Amino acid sequence: MYQKRQAPTLSSKEAAIQLLSRRDHGLYELHQKLAMKGYEEADIEAAINFCLEHNYLDDLRYAKSQVRQHVYKGHGERRIRQELNQKRVAESVIEQAMAEEPQDWFELAKLAAEKKFKGIKAKDQKEYAKQVRFLQYRGYSFDQISYALSFEDED
């Protein structure tokens, strides 16, 4: 039922470079992908060290690109932090990436609400709760959600 994995044809360094040529990866993510391809732990470490030395692998660059990508999708700060934590990016790197990619989270929450609800104010408490849940899922704080939803009635 299960096939035994064959030995990889590429060296671990070549495989790492091939993965990084398509898109940026985090250190942990690259480690996992190489392990899934069947490389030995020592080969994986050598490939990662090679990529770090030649600046092919950079967690800060990866985190900044993830922040930009999630902001474009309309996600809030909490969601972005959670995603980066799941990908095991160091907290200090996340802080630095967030500082280097400054955003107005209140305005982004407002834009996300306008896009989803087309500027229509909630008619009742049930509808308001639905809008709040949507923005919470997107990763916005309650202050940002309050700003986004109360701002609509002023237009």
Swiss-Prot record:
Pfam families membership: RecX_HTH1, RecX_HTH2, RecX_HTH3
Annotated GO CC locations: cytoplasm
Keywords, comma-separated and alphabetical: Cytoplasm
Entry keyword annotation includes Metal-binding: no
Any GO BP: regulation of DNA repair
InterPro entries xref list: RecX_HTH_1st (IPR053926), RecX_HTH_2nd (IPR053924), RecX_HTH_3rd (IPR053925), Regulatory_RecX (IPR003783), WH-like_DNA-bd_sf (IPR036388)
Location in or out of the cell: Cytoplasm
Highest taxon of source: Bacteria
Gene3D superfamilies reported in the protein's UniProt record: Winged helix-like DNA-binding domain superfamily/Winged helix DNA-binding domain
Main subcellular location: cytoplasm
Protein family according to the UniProt entry: Belongs to the RecX family.
Protein role: Modulates RecA activity.
Protein's name in the database: Regulatory protein RecX
UniProt source species: Vibrio parahaemolyticus serotype O3:K6 (strain RIMD 2210633)
